[in-house]
């Protein structure tokens, strides 16, 4: 259910873009993200930090897009989110000395410290590369290609990278945890 809720604003954005335009899609994205946030709070009595950060950025960049009638703001939102994620991962590893991935998953998984560090760094690099790809596609290719990349390309890349991370984790799990 939670995964569906995470993707709902993206689906709404895509549908409104195809039916109307980028500005209607942006307004719909703001509303859908707010509804998902409210529903999460009412249903689960919890809102994850990532969801809250994403909501704030959607409202800020979406609001700027609508106010100035300029789609560049909503295009930048994707890169800013990825930069924040990458930054949080890198700060957790290099400043706080405990990778964020480890903080999030250590209750469920037992892995050697170097594996946590490599996994954390890999996700940081992944987010940086996705942010850079977004900049290129958003500002050098037509808007419709960017929307398709945002909805399908980044989603597919994230699913593939998650699968690869799962394989990497499985290879380094203690034998007793694999069963």
UniProtKB/Swiss-Prot annotation:
Its biological purpose: Plays a role in cell envelope biogenesis, maintenance of cell envelope integrity and membrane homeostasis. Essential for normal cell division. Involved in virulence through intercellular spreading.
Chief place of localization: membrane
Cell compartment(s), UniProt: Cell inner membrane
Name the UniProt record assigns to this protein: Inner membrane-spanning protein YciB
Keywords in alphabetical order: Cell inner membrane, Cell membrane, Membrane, Transmembrane, Transmembrane helix, Virulence
Sequence ranges on the Cytoplasmic membrane side: 43-49, 97-120, 170-179
A GO CC annotation given for this chain: plasma membrane
Membrane topology: Multi-pass membrane protein
